[in-house]
Amino acid sequence: MKYGIIKKYFVVVAALMVGATSCLDKMPESAIPVDEAMQSFDDAEQTVTGIYSMMKSSALWSGLITLLPDIQTDLVYAVDGYSNTYGQHWLWNIRSTNSEVESVYAALYGIISNCNFYLEKIDGIIAKQTLDEKITILEQYTGEVYAIRALCYSELLKFYCKAYDPATAENELGVVIRKYYSTPERSVRASLKDSYEFVLSDLKKAEEILDPDYDGYNSPYMTNAVAHALHARVALYMQEWDEAIEHATEVIERDTHYILVPANVEWSGGMSYFDRMWNYDFSYETLWQVGFTTTSYGGALGQVFLNFNNDFTYYYPDYVPAQWVLDLYVSGDLRYNAYFATLSTGYDHGLQWPLLVKYYGNQDYIANYIYHVTTPKPFRLAEQYLIRAEALCRKQNPDFSGASKDLSTLRENRFASGGSVSLSEENFIEEIANERIRELYMEGHRLQDLKRWGKLYRGGEGFTRTPQKSSLSEGSSISIKADDVRLVWPIPQHELEAPGSEVVKNESNN
């Protein structure tokens, strides 16, 4: 079944895990008409629970959104003999009918549709409440839904739109903005400027509604701090440097809730607090992580890097870290041993290589024979330090001293000792780019970074892959410049052809 943007009814099935569709023209037997759905406090709570459940999808943070932006670029190499998982992205053969391109688009708009449904109904439910406690809870839910909708639109903008340039954004294509659930809306793309402004509008509502008292590390729910963290990220993408600094600082200064966890302090059994974040999905610096449990989880982030459960004897990685990435980690950088381990593979060529073990899997899940499943952590405090450092360097009056302090603070928590760094006009973009790789490796930032930096980074030369040991010959010598139209994913073909669609395609659709 092909998915589209518009949904005309609310399906209550599998915890409300539904998507939008443009090819269904009648109500299924399992559906509840819109005017009969979400009538009570309990209904509202169930709807929000369903939205969070949808966010576990392997098309999103537990899979495609996290992995493809880094696999597509220069951070990994496909191994000779690999399973061809994500092969079209590795080869830059990205088509409008590509299943990953369709899945990400459908999953994000599916969540947006459910958010719109909730927002359409919630005022009527709040008006019927007589207990202040329930009103407060519903208002909190509403803030969470605004934050979720903003997050989903921000992801669509990352994948399916050009990088934001304030000078041209008004004339560039954004995304189709769906504000309502029942009210008909044209299937037409807004400008890039208006699309980003809509995200900011939702974030401002979330920031106003969400009570900071509910902030807390390891939260499976949207919080006030998460809204500010997303605001900082979006502002960075928009080149609104002061705004990015303001919101990143808002998060960083909440040090009673969040702190950078040290890789140089033991937590237990030889494992550091930083190791604990990846081995047990517990960290004081995680602002929001998808709400996985051993009985309810999404994709397995570590699968393509290990594939140990093929025969439970050898590793069969589809992708291994690029040598140049491994070389970025200098002596004393404890992230190296937290992220990588040299292991033998089961391939005939016998490759032995530092494999990515960052996503080896939560130890509690492994004890239940669930392999390579790590809870996605889309918002960590570390990213806020990186955002603020870059914004401090790129604002009208750069503050390289302040930026150096931010990077040094992050690195001092990741190194056995030392870690300080000094930024200047000459080296800041290379240093920040490298630190973003070291810290955020395989967390889904590289594609957007290359796109938004453009000529600032490596003169716009982008990257060139150079074959490494046992790498797949096809794709290992690709060169991609920063202005390559394929940095923007194509709009799914079925959206262009859907009845009533006025959606304009991207250059990469050609």
What are these regions (language model features)?
Residues 1-33:
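Bacterial Sec-dependent N-terminal signal peptides
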Residues 34, 38, 62-80, 124, ...:
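Short, surface-exposed recognition loops and adjoining beta-strand edges that mediate ligand/DNA contacts
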Residues 196, 241, 398-400:
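TPR-repeat structural position
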Residues 22-72, 309, 316, 325, ...:
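Membrane-proximal, proline-rich intrinsically disordered regions
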Residues 194, 238-239, 245-249, 253-369, ...:
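Extended ligand-binding clefts on enzyme/binding-domain cores
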Residues 84-160, 190, 208-211, 369-376, ...:
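Conserved, well-structured interaction surfaces
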